[in-house]
UniProtKB/Swiss-Prot annotation:
Subunit structure: Homohexamer. Forms an RuvA(8)-RuvB(12)-Holliday junction (HJ) complex. HJ DNA is sandwiched between 2 RuvA tetramers; dsDNA enters through RuvA and exits via RuvB. An RuvB hexamer assembles on each DNA strand where it exits the tetramer. Each RuvB hexamer is contacted by two RuvA subunits (via domain III) on 2 adjacent RuvB subunits; this complex drives branch migration. In the full resolvosome a probable DNA-RuvA(4)-RuvB(12)-RuvC(2) complex forms which resolves the HJ.
Chain's gene name: ruvB
Protein name: Holliday junction branch migration complex subunit RuvB
Keywords annotated in UniProt: ATP-binding, Cytoplasm, DNA damage, DNA recombination, DNA repair, DNA-binding, Hydrolase, Nucleotide-binding
Organism: Shewanella sp. (strain W3-18-1)
Source lineage: Bacteria, Pseudomonadati, Pseudomonadota, Gammaproteobacteria, Alteromonadales
Binding site for ATP: 24, 65, 68-70, 131-133, 174, 184, 221
Subcellular location: Cytoplasm
Length: 334
């Protein structure tokens, strides 16, 4: 298993949660990046408010750490309604979901993170709730059991997932607003780092914010985490101000290189290059070679490496690109 304290892992760490809440934007106008998504949401939200209706159900998908939870909260704020949050693995029984649904008020947002991990029995309850705002409940057991329907107030379900392909087709089809989040560019990440530094009361210059941003793997959660670690270095080794020099030395000390890679990324790429002659190599063989689970490679390590053009997926397996060889100052065989 990948180490839980990996500094640049995009998944939420315990220490991230409280700090990230303070840094989260509350409204769309405060939200940086994802321009197409923001533009779409502004239209959908304004239209729903003009009609005095609940916003259509929304599926937000993309790699971890890009702001799916933040967007769900912004939607609730923009609509002026409450939000109740849960996650797929927590909803083990139909009654767990029923308890949440029956406590919603008109227009409220129900946010389900990791919605691809809903159990089939819970998913079945969700279908009529999403389509008809009705809840089917079984009363009694055996031959005497009967179904009753409860009317629900109009509500908005916001589902978030890193694996949209793992959703069943019937569930996916019930979301009227699908939104894909992409990795952030360095300019937008620099803006996020600067804003977070202001919230934290830190002194940071443009070059310092840029240095942190370019090593943050296109992910705001990682950018904020690196900012906190660079702050520690700046306070202990310097005068507390974060410059390009300070950020560069701090991140080198933390073993986060100029591309935002750490030892796990380098281990993966070097395994393809050295052990499998650049590939192609199947996912199971690659997982065995680096001692990780295939899901970890698919969900955590690969997305950014593929997006940046360091490895490729092919029908025959993973291959290291010329850019991967260049990163290690190696010559790619012809």
């Amino acid at each position: 298993m990948i180490e839980a304290d990996r500094l640049i892992q995009p998944q939420l760490q315990v220490q991230d949660d409280v700090v990230d809440r303070a840094m989260r934007p509350k409204l769309l106008d405060e939200y940086t990046g994802q321009d197409d998504t923001r533009a779409q949401l502004k239209v959908f939200i304004q239209a729903a408010k003009n009609r005095n209706e609940a916003l259509d159900h929304m599926l937000i998908y993309g790699p971890p750490g890009l702001g799916k939870t933040t967007l769900a909260m912004i939607v609730a704020n923009e609509m002026g309604v409450n939000i109740k949050s849960t996650s797929g693995p927590v909803l083990e029984k139909a009654g767990d979901l029923a308890a949440l649904l029956t406590n919603l008020e008109s227009g409220d947002v129900l946010f389900i993170d990791e919605i691809h991990r809903l159990s089939p029995v819970v998913e079945e309850i969700l279908y009529p709730a999403m389509e008809d705002y009705q809840l089917d409940i079984m009363i009694g057991e055996g031959p005497a059991a009967r179904s009753i329907k409860l009317d629900l107030p109009p509500f908005t379900l916001v589902g978030a997932t890193t694996r949209a392909g793992a959703l069943t087709s019937p569930l996916r089809a019930r979301f009227g607003i699908p939104l894909r989040l992409e990795f952030y560019n360095i300019k937008d990440l620099s803006t996020i780092v600067t804003r977070s530094a202001q919230v934290m009361g830190l002194e940071i210059d443009t070059e310092g914010a840029f240095e942190i941003a370019r090593r943050s793997r296109g992910t705001p959660r990682i950018a904020n985490r690196l900012l906190r670690r660079v702050r520690d270095y700046a306070e202990v080794k310097h005068d507390g101000a974060i410059t390009q020099f300070v950020a560069d030395h701090a991140l080198d000390l933390l073993d986060v290189d100029n591309e935002g890679f750490d030892y796990m990324d380098r281990k993966l790429m070097l395994a393809i290059i050295d052990k499998f002659m650049g590939g192609p190599v199947g996912l199971d063989n690659l997982a065995a070679a680096i001692g990780e689970e295939r899901e970890t490679i698919e969900d955590v390590l690969e997305p950014f490496l593929i997006q940046q053009g360091f490895i490729q997926r092919t029908p025959r397996g993973r291959i290291a690109t010329a850019r991967a060889y260049q990163h290690f100052q190696l010559i790619k065989p012809e």
